[in-house]
């Protein structure tokens, strides 16, 4: 039987391991560097800090532990996270999204629609989202909460339950 820990316990112990190079018990912060390898073509697992570094690896392990997930991915920006999330959806996916979005997301969505990758339906309120989930085919529900710029909030758990019941995936940006 696996013991379940409270969030505070997970966070207090995340990243606590002995650093081989320094003996530090808490993971040091690695800002920017390149890494030495034993020989050409044999990586230590870290090449350049912009692809992977020990600090981000610790953060990803911590996020996975908090969510009881096998793994988590950290990206360099919110837009890169959105692009990464949408990369798993097939061409032609029908996306239901909140209308009040960060401008960069809205522009990227428009570009994707113009290129024929996805089709988007937008809703202004939670009631409209529920209506579309009940009546329209939806492959992906995309919500931003609180929204930008109007700071609207949505019941993520309720919307996710409805979307999952219809077989839709849910992407949440906050």
How would you label these PLM feature ranges?
Residues 23, 63, 81, 95, ...:
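Buried hydrophobic positions in well-ordered alpha/beta secondary-structure cores of metabolic enzymes
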Residues 146-169:
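Active-site core of PLP-dependent enzymes with the aminotransferase class I/II
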């Amino acid at each position: 039987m696996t013991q379940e820990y409270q969030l505070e316990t997970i966070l207090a112990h995340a990243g606590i391991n002995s650093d081989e190079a320094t003996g530090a018990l808490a993971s040091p912060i690695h800002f920017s560097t390149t890494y030495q390898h034993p020989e050409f073509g044999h990586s230590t697992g870290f090449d350049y800090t912009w692809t992977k570094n020990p600090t981000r690896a610790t953060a990803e392990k911590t996020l996975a532990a908090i969510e009881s997930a096998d793994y988590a991915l950290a990206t360099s920006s919110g837009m890169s996270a959105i692009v990464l999330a949408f990369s798993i959806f097939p061409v032609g996916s029908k996306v239901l999204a909140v209308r009040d979005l960060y401008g960069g997301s809205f522009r990227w969505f428009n570009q994707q629609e113009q290129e024929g990758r996805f089709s988007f339906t937008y809703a202004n309120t939670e009631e409209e989202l529920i209506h579309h989930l009940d009546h329209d085919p939806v492959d992906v529900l995309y919500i931003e909460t609180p929204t930008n710029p109007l700071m609207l909030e949505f019941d993520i758990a309720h919307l996710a339950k409805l979307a999952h019941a219809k077989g839709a995936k849910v992407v949440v940006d906050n």
